[in-house]
Amino acid sequence: MTKEKTINLSFGRTICKASINDLSIVMELIEQGKAKMIKAGNPNQWSASYPAESTIKCDIAQGDCYLLYECGKPIATFVAKAGPEPNYHRIYKGDWLDDQPYYVIHRVASVEGVHGVMADIIKYCSTLTSSIRIDTHADNRPMQASLTRLGFVYCGVIYVENGDSRLAFQCVF
């Protein structure tokens, strides 16, 4: 666990940047996240090969990959980085809330049975920016519910590299 930029949260939770030494932990969390998505009726958001280990290595190298720990145990991973996000240049069936600088959150994955992960991620990201954008699959109902509960506004539809559509959300603090 990298000690720099550690953010203390409630319930013995901390968030810190992942290092290359954490790669296997991040990949295991992603596999658990995939299983959770399938179980929740969202089998199509992440494929067997996405996110690839090479993508995660790049996220880590750029300093954008994070781990959420509870009492010293890794329970979630995510990517948070400053925009612009190329897939967000065009939005359909709506508009972004503003044109100000923002952070984007990607690749959120957590172990089964933990709650409040998105709230902790948003709390951390709100220390970095006053605007967050995120997208999710139409079948990812748990994520959509979390985002709405946390004050995100549905803004429209974006398309990712492979042409699949995603629901786009934004929160301005």
Task: Identify what each model region corresponds to.
Residues 13-28:
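A short beta-loop-alpha structural element at the N-terminal edge
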Residues 34-54:
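Conserved GNAT-fold acetyl-CoA-binding loop/helix
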Residues 67, 73-84:
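Conserved beta-strand in the GNAT
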Residues 79-113:
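Conserved acyl-donor/pantetheine-binding loop and adjacent beta-alpha core of acyl/acetyltransferases
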Residues 110-127, 145-149:
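Conserved acetyl-CoA-binding loop-helix of GNAT-fold acetyltransferases
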Residues 127-139:
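Conserved GNAT acetyl-CoA-binding A-motif
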Residues 135, 153-167:
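Conserved catalytic-core motifs of GNAT/GCN5-like acyltransferases
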Residues 139-156:
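Conserved active-site alpha-helix within GNAT-family acetyltransferase domains
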